[in-house]
Amino acid sequence: MNDTGSHFDVPEEATLPEDLRKLFAKARERLGFLPNVFRVYSYRPQRLSAWFAHYRQLHEPTENLSAADREMIAVVVSAANGCLYCLVAHGAALRVELGDGVLGERISYDWRRAGLDARRRAICAYAEKLTRDPRNVDREDLQNLLNAGLTPEEAWDVIEIAAMYNFTNRLATGTNMLPNEEYSGQARP
């Protein structure tokens, strides 16, 4: 095991393709550290590139689905799955995006009791149901998102973001990825 916690060897950064080395440099510049998700996923460099391209597309804010909403979905799914890495990392990102560490913490622990408005409650309920009980997701669940003010495209994004984090949670948990310590101090109340 290494400092990422991964059960797999983490490649030396110098051995990675140039596009990933540039991505790592940008992450360090923006965050002040290199997230372990990049280090661990670099075990399969081409897949990391594809995963990150998809991640970036899904995290583009829209009129009714903000960056904070998108991080909130990641947190709700990660909490439902018990994914340590993603819950810590996206919990930190949610606190930053909300500009409200208290609300971010409440959502991370129990979105139902966080004092969310009806739109955000509908988003969280959908993401959690798709995670915990996918076989029973139906048209009514989708309609709840639309009734909450999301466009069909934004409802699609809720579905796709939840699906991506279900995948990512399983990869992070399966590899034994540990969150960077730096996340713990970000945007705390």
Task: Label each residue range with its predicted role.
Residues 1-189:
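Hydrophobic alpha-helical segments
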